[in-house]
Each structure stands twice: as C-alpha cells, then as structure tokens.
Amino acid sequence: MSGYCRGRSQFPSIPGAGCRLGWGLLLPIRALFMETSLLLSMAGFALAMSITPGPVNLVALGSGARHGFAASLRHVVGATLGFILLLLLMGLGLGATLLQWPAAAELLRWGGVIFLGWMAWQLLVDSSRVEGVDGVAPSFWYGALMQWLNPKAWLAASMGMGAYGSAGGVGQAALFSGLYLVICLCSIACWAYAGSPLQGLLLVPPR
C-alpha cells in the first residue's frame, strides 16, 4: 500500500503525500456522514415515539377541539418539558435506581395503570371532558404529570437513552435530549392544532 501511495503521489519530493492528502480529505467527509446518520436516526426515533397516538396526544387533541390551539399550549409545553425531564433522569441513571428499588417501580407501574383506567373511563362517560376537569383547559402541570404516569413515555425514555444516550456519553445524551425536545413539542402541538378546527362545531348549541 505504501508503494502504491508513493507511486501516485502528487508531490514526488514527499513520499506518500498524495495518499495522506486524500485520506485527510476523506476523514472529515466520513465523520460528517456518520454524524448525519446518527442525527437522522435520533430524529426518526423521536418522531415515531412523539407523533403516534397516546394519552398525552389525545388530551392535546381534545383540548384543541374544546378550548382552541392557544389555550392548549400550556398542556403542550408542560407535557414536553415533563418528558424531557424524565428523559434526562433516565440518562443519569433513574432506570438503574428503579431496578434497585422494586417497590418504587411497582408504584409507578400501578400509577400508570390507574391513570390509563381513568382516561378510558373519561372517554367512555364523557369524551368532552377528556382534556381536563370541569371544562377547564389542561394546565402546564397537568401535562407534565401525565408524562410521568404515561407508560409510553417511560418506554420511550428508557429505549431512547439506552440506544443513543448511554453509549455516547454526556454530550450525545444532551444532543439527543435537545433534538427530542423540539420534535416532541412540535408533535404534541400538531395534535392540539388538529383538534382546533373542531372547536366551532362543539360550540354550536344543539337544536
């Protein structure tokens, strides 16, 4: 290989200079390609977990239909930041801590079951009340708490940090969290915006 490089050198006085120059140009391109592939993989995972139907997104849809898009932004922001906090704590070792405290993990598991049961009951009894209590738009803290009782959020946080955060160190975990924040915020906002056109229909009094 070294003979081939010396034979193809563009600088006869410097053996292998052409080969080294070629590799020097290829290495940044290869690094850029790998970085882009990683970012696309992160974004694809975050989008798949954020945009698909779930309790938080259904609440955003119902809130948009009942109260409009602007009033639903508190829930959107609260749910986003609540999940990002969960994601960061998973990256800092929350999952390993819960494995050492089975009682805490069991408490969270049953809290999620009760929460999903309550959501199903609200949908069954009165779908117009799914987004809050007494016709009030869901608050910031309501959205944040929902994520901590949402099994889908726990699954996404554990899988995401396991795939992209743990092996890459603090920098990659922070990059993943920042990217997830933007995608999660936009995804939940899309559900709230999708429900807002229905607001006028819900406000029409029955004849």
What are these regions (language model features)?
Residues 56, 82, 86-94, 116-119, ...:
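Alpha-helical transmembrane segments and their lipid-water interface positions
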Residues 99-128, 184-191, 199-207:
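Selective transmembrane alpha-helices of multi-pass membrane proteins
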Residues 36-103, 159-176:
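Juxtamembrane transmembrane-helix termini in multi-pass membrane transport proteins
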Residues 125-138:
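Flexible cytoplasmic inter-helical loops of multi-pass small-molecule transporters
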Residues 147-155:
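Selected transmembrane alpha-helices and immediately adjacent juxtamembrane segments
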